[in-house]
Amino acid sequence: MNIEELAARIDHTVLGPTTTMDEVTDVLSDAAAYGMNACIPPCYLDAAGDTDMVTDSGVTLVSVIGFPHGQHASIAKRKEAVTAWQAGADEIDVVLNIGRLKTSATETVTHDIAEVVAAVPIPVKVIIETTLLNDDEKRRACKVAVDADADFIKTSTGFANGGATTADVEVLSSYLPVKASGGISSYETAKSMLDAGAERIGASAGVEILEDAPDIYYD
């Protein structure tokens, strides 16, 4: 792939607890300039959708649901998803209920995600927070995403210790397309995730990744 194709796989991200509209505007500007997607808090979707950077460049707006811990009630996640879509989100990343997954309440967790998927006509990525799961739990989380008809599995929120690993990406990508996120701040790390099978990269360092990348094609 070339640099333009790489950029289209990056969700340039700003999701910190102190995120301001000025920071969102910077991310949107970078996304428009480099051809990336933009992942922003849901509270800024309305304003973001009204900016010329989005309307003129066609930046894909990604937002988050049940973020960052996944412990919202199902009805709240569903409402959040609908509100985000109506405010202009093109895709949503929803956090799986990790505590319930760990207590083997798989049917409840699947229903939780399926409610979100059914509520909106846009792609849904399920954040499973790999760093908090053992191997069996990772596989069960992937099965939840598949059974709920989600479109992607996302490794991490970026709020737990650790982030994406190539080993996890290899396993997760056997279930659904993978968005690797958490700790990806260089071209080499991003490339390693793509080589492991990731389809999308989530990173606050989108510009740095692209500026560090050689303008070459690779398998």
UniProtKB/Swiss-Prot annotation:
Family: Belongs to the DeoC/FbaB aldolase family. DeoC type 1 subfamily.
Location of the protein in the cell: Cytoplasm
Cellular component aspect of the GO annotation: cytoplasm
Disulfide linkage: none
Catalytically driven reaction(s): 2-deoxy-D-ribose 5-phosphate = D-glyceraldehyde 3-phosphate + acetaldehyde
Gene this protein is translated from: deoC
Enzyme Commission number(s) of this protein: 4.1.2.4
Keywords, alphabetical: Cytoplasm, Lyase, Schiff base
NCBIfam families named in the record: deoC
Pfam families named among the record's database cross-references: DeoC
Active site: residue positions: 93 (proton donor/acceptor), 154 (schiff-base intermediate with acetaldehyde), 179 (proton donor/acceptor)
InterPro entries: Aldolase_TIM (IPR013785), DeoC (IPR011343), DeoC/FbaB/LacD_aldolase (IPR002915), DeoC_typeI (IPR028581)
Superkingdom: Archaea
Record protein name field: Deoxyribose-phosphate aldolase
GO BP of this protein: 2-deoxyribose 1-phosphate catabolic process; carbohydrate catabolic process; deoxyribonucleotide catabolic process
Job of this protein: Catalyzes a reversible aldol reaction between acetaldehyde and D-glyceraldehyde 3-phosphate to generate 2-deoxy-D-ribose 5-phosphate.
ATP-binding listed as a keyword: no
Molecular functions per Gene Ontology: deoxyribose-phosphate aldolase activity
Pathway note: Carbohydrate degradation; 2-deoxy-D-ribose 1-phosphate degradation; D-glyceraldehyde 3-phosphate and acetaldehyde from 2-deoxy-alpha-D-ribose 1-phosphate: step 2/2
